[in-house]
Amino acid sequence: MNGSTHPEGSRAFDREYEGTLESLRSTRNDVSAWLRTNECDHEMVERAVLVTSELASNAVQAAPGCPYGVKIRAAGESLVELAVSNQFVSTSPPDRDRWFPTTPTAPRGRGLSIVEALSRDVRVDVDDSVVCVTALLQTAPDQ
């Protein structure tokens, strides 16, 4: 890819994982390896792995035991779209204005705010039976 910072023109990443906490390590490793294979720079790989980890953790917590999917694709010049989807079980993700912990010391509730801070944009789509959170990541510094 001639030193580019993202996987433009490469095949997309599309995998499904078991809905268990034990699967999170494999998910992070697979995403990291795929991005490095596609010559993404270190900073981009680190951000994408953290975003993946937060979204996959949310998917497992929202639907324990149900598989979740991870997709990554180039989304234009210097952008990568990373999506994690899971079965809709009982509750949908909170509205954007509630993407923070209820108190500063709360043990949970930071995932979507972390994803939002690391992403150019975040979209939550809820279908009849599937929740899909898509993060748009900038792969190169703004010019």
Regions found by a protein language model. Give the residues of each.
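Residues in soluble alpha-helical coiled-coils and helical-bundle/repeat scaffolds
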Residues: 22, 39-43, 123
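Short, structured helix-loop boundary elements
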Residues: 21-24, 45, 112
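Conserved short strand/loop->alpha-helix "switch" segment adjacent to the catalytic nucleotide/phosphoryl-transfer site
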Residues: 29-53, 104
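Histidine-centered phosphotransfer motif of kinases
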Residues: 47-65
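STAS-typified acidic loop motif
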Residues: 14-26
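Conserved beta-strand-loop-beta-strand hairpin that lines the nucleotide-binding pocket
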Residues: 1-14, 60-143
